């Protein structure tokens, strides 16, 4: 019997079990053709048994701010505040958090007028008549430039200290998984009755970059002692009398929240769940999704362990499956939206920010030691195999 292994603390090295991230696990893999003049890439097919992933999403809500991804018009990115006394009531989803919840925000600034710095603000509001304490358990926020540019990386790299990443989202999530809270984030916020606190005031500068494009990814785990509402907003840096830029104040963020509309431009409108005509458009997520974690033991049916496959055989478990991409399992893992804007995604496709904690209790049924390889793959998105 091989001891149980947690895939997120140890990944062994020569394969017969395949675990695929970002859209699932499968056997088909096709590189993207980036230059039309080059020959079409080959389609690699590997025979494998694809299984439905056991378990389910937990009930911890996730504030998911990802639409619009490319911000050119300042405004409200995502607000779960009550719509009362707001100039644009439809921009506020009226969803309160209590206890543990997570916050994910991912937005870009692209060629802004006069290269002005775009700020992303995150607000928390206490609607009650008693103080509320919000603990910031872990938190990280990174810019694409210079913190975490997108770069091609080897298929497998050791990263004992979190030094391997490509893009700000990967680096932020890596920090949170390591239990890090960056110094820019407070250990806790004490919010007085009826008051609003500023959790984040993050600039996305583009001036001085070779291309005036930059982005920011933020991931935070929070725990509140009472009900709170949350919002993310985008605002171009206010200017001082001398023309220089400064960070927005809490009061300026509140004014935008109370009087502003949704930031723009808006992303593509998604295909309804019952839509059957035309291309399937997922849309981008802006809302509150149900579930921040997925725990499971990968075992054979009616068993307590997973028998090592015969030599040359492969077992795959699908991760982050979604509508139109269940990889033959008919299982949709995408988180349900508890609150969303009408022009944004119906489900949290891709499950960004969801922590998969998978245990594989392997059982060696042979009479000799066996070497098992565990790998994460990104296959072609298919619904049927």
Which residue ranges define each predicted feature?
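Beta-strand-rich interaction surfaces with strong enrichment in secreted/lumenal proteins
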Residues: 92-93, 186-189, 345-348
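N-terminal, Lys/Arg-enriched amphipathic/low-complexity engagement segments
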Residues: 40-98
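Terminal connector regions
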Residues: 206-249
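Intrinsically disordered, low-complexity Pro/Gly/Ser/Thr-rich segments with frequent PxxP/GP/PP motifs
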Residues: 150-208
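N-terminal secretory signal peptides that target proteins for export/translocation
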Residues: 1-8
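Asparagine-centered strand-capping/turn motif at beta-strand->loop junctions
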Residues: 97, 107-112, 116-118, 123-132, ...
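Short aromatic-acidic-glycine turn motif
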Residues: 70-72, 141-158, 229-231, 244, ...
């Amino acid at each position: 019997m091989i001891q149980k292994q947690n895939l997120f603390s140890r990944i062994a090295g020569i394969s017969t079990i395949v675990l695929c991230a970002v859209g699932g696990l499968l056997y088909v893999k096709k590189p993207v053709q980036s230059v039309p003049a080059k020959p079409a890439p080959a389609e690699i097919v590997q025979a494998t048994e694809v299984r439905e992933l056991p378990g389910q999403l937990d009930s911890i809500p996730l504030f998911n701010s990802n639409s619009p991804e490319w911000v050119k018009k300042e405004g409200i990115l995502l607000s779960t505040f009550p719509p009362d006394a707001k100039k644009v009531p439809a921009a506020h989803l009226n969803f309160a958090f209590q206890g543990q919840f997570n916050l994910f925000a991912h937005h870009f600034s692209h060629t802004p007028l006069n290269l002005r710095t775009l700020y992303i603000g995150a607000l928390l509001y206490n609607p009650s008549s008693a103080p509320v304490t919000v603990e910031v358990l872990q938190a990280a926020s990174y810019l694409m430039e210079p913190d975490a540019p997108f770069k091609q990386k080897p298929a497998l790299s050791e990263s004992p200290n979190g030094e391997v990443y490509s893009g700000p989202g990967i680096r932020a999530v890596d920090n949170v998984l390591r239990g890090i809270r960056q110094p820019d984030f407070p250990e806790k916020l004490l919010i007085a009755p009826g008051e609003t606190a500023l959790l984040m005031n993050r600039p996305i500068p583009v001036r001085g970059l070779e291309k005036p494009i930059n982005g920011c990814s933020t991931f935070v785990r929070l725990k509140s002692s009472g009900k709170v509402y949350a919002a993310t907003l985008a605002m171009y840096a206010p200017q001082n009398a001398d023309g220089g830029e400064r960070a927005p104040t809490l009061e300026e963020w509140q004014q935008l929240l109370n009087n502003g509309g949704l930031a723009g431009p808006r992303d593509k409108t998604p295909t309804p769940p019952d839509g059957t005509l035309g291309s399937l458009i997922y849309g981008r997520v802006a809302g509150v999704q149900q579930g921040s974690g997925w725990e499971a033991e990968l075992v054979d049916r009616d068993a307590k362990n997973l028998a090592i496959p015969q030599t040359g055989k492969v077992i795959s478990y699908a991760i982050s499956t979604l509508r139109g991409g269940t990889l033959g399992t008919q299982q949709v893992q995408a988180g349900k939206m508890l609150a969303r804007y009408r022009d944004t995604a119906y489900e949290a496709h891709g499950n960004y920010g969801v922590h998969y904690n998978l245990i594989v209790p392997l059982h060696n049924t042979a009479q000799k030691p066996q070497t098992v390889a565990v790998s994460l793959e990104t296959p072609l998105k298919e619904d049927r195999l």
